[in-house]
Amino acid sequence: MISVDFSKGLVPTIILDDQNGDVLMLAYMNEESYQKTLETGYTWFFSRSRNELWNKGATSGHTQKVKQIWTDCDNDTLLIRVTQIGPACHTGKKSCFFNLIKEDF
């Protein structure tokens, strides 16, 4: 198995919808949340604001069932394809990326 580089503590983690490849959210994992994700098959992250682990959807029911886990060329960023149940964003939107800044460059 490929080793993820947690030497800086947190690893950016991009979450994609496995059905269509849409970007759902960006969160951070530490080694403990990564291990819990591997063990349970559901996403676990590290909350920088609350300084604690959180299981995505534990409160809302909007869970993320892991389908695939990828790492980048430096092994310090993760991309996880999931089956998303309900919206991924705490605002109720499907994706956390819904604020267009500019287009048509």
From Swiss-Prot:
First-listed, main subcellular location of the protein, grouped into a coarse class: cytoplasm
**Pathway it belongs to?**
Amino-acid biosynthesis; L-histidine biosynthesis; L-histidine from 5-phospho-alpha-D-ribose 1-diphosphate: step 3/9
Q: Which Pfam families match?
A: PRA-CH
Q: Does the keyword Flavoprotein apply?
A: no
Q: Which GO terms describe its molecular function?
A: magnesium ion binding; phosphoribosyl-AMP cyclohydrolase activity; zinc ion binding
Q: Where in the cell is it found?
A: Cytoplasm
Output one GO BP term. L-histidine biosynthetic process
- What Enzyme Commission number(s) does the record list for this chain? 3.5.4.19
Arranged from A to Z, the UniProt key words for this protein are: Amino-acid biosynthesis, Cytoplasm, Histidine biosynthesis, Hydrolase, Magnesium, Metal-binding, Zinc
> What's this protein's family per the entry?
Belongs to the PRA-CH family.
Subunit: Homodimer.
Known NCBIfam families for this protein?
PRK00051.1
**What does this chain do?**
Catalyzes the hydrolysis of the adenine ring of phosphoribosyl-AMP.
What protein name does the entry list? Phosphoribosyl-AMP cyclohydrolase
Source species of the chain? Listeria monocytogenes serovar 1/2a (strain ATCC BAA-679 / EGD-e)
